Amino acid sequence: MTITPEALALSGHKFRKELLQMPVHAMQETIQHMTVRRGIRYAETVGELTGNIDLGPYSETRIDNDGMNIKGRTLYTFLGSVVKKFSPNSVVKSIYDSAVTKGENLKSVDIALRVLSYLTAKLGGNLQSHIWDAKRNDSGTTSADLFNGFDTITASEIGANTISTSIGNLYEFSEAITASNAVDMIKAFCEAASELLVDAGQQVKLFCSPGIYRAYLKDYQATVGAIPYNTEYKKTVVEGFENVSFVPLYNKSKSPYMHLTTQGNMLVGVNQEGEEEDITIEKHEAFVLQYIATMFFGVQFESINKERLLVGKLFNG
């Protein structure tokens, strides 16, 4: 089956909205644990209201003059672009052969949409891979250069002393986490968190590498014995902290940090609305097409206050 450039271009135009949403759908493994903010074009100020108000014994003269403040943080989304040459026949053949094997009777419009969906989902997969370690580089060429990931933002805040042990939003591990000490180490980490973060009845997520999670499972088995372990093979919460759930992610496998926070504090910014974002197919050479995409993407912590976030800096020999 041959798909013409015109058919691909028509599908791109017809399904533009769905295709622009596809990179986000392709990131669900990670962003299901975060909060997606749509309609963010370049920047939006986020943050929280701070201050206090206290009810005391009745007084006609007492006035509380302490101010209420908004601690603002900026969620930046960066406009990214890609122009990818590809041979439509090779992609179509792969999709069509797979459909035939599954007994699907696909029409040309279905194949065209699947070609575009395949390429667009790849964009989302690469953004997901670098959601922690990406570092903005204006002259870069990859997803890792497009925006500042959560680990990059964390390192910048540590460098600015806005995340620190003295403030209470940083915990520094004194030794490596292994299968022999993971339970005690991670419990100590959670115990160091503000009680307003871990003891306020809200659901909290512990973002970590799969290696750390596996070490915890092994140590948990050795610590509690075979019977309890076998009845709950996948220990998904931290012992003693039933509201703290492990979130082991492949894209955090080389991360120097763990993050203890809530889903609402992890912001992922996209636009998906403006004219700047588009997905088109153009033909400039015989047998070769160009897939052209532009879209916004960025991440940010809504707050780095200790009541919302505790960063665990892993031991580095």
Regions found by a protein language model. Name each.
Residues 179-192, 226-232:
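Well-ordered, non-membrane alpha-helical segments in soluble/globular domains
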Residues 189-198, 202:
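Short, basic/hydrophobic alpha-helical segments
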Residues 17-97:
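Assembly/oligomerization interface modules of large self-assembling protein complexes
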Residues 2-52, 148-176, 202, 210-317:
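Sequence/fold signature of self-assembling virion shell proteins
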Residues 94, 128, 215-217:
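Short helix/loop capping segments that flank catalytic or ligand/cofactor-binding pockets
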Residues 97-188, 317:
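Alpha-helical scaffold segments that mediate packing/assembly in large oligomeric complexes
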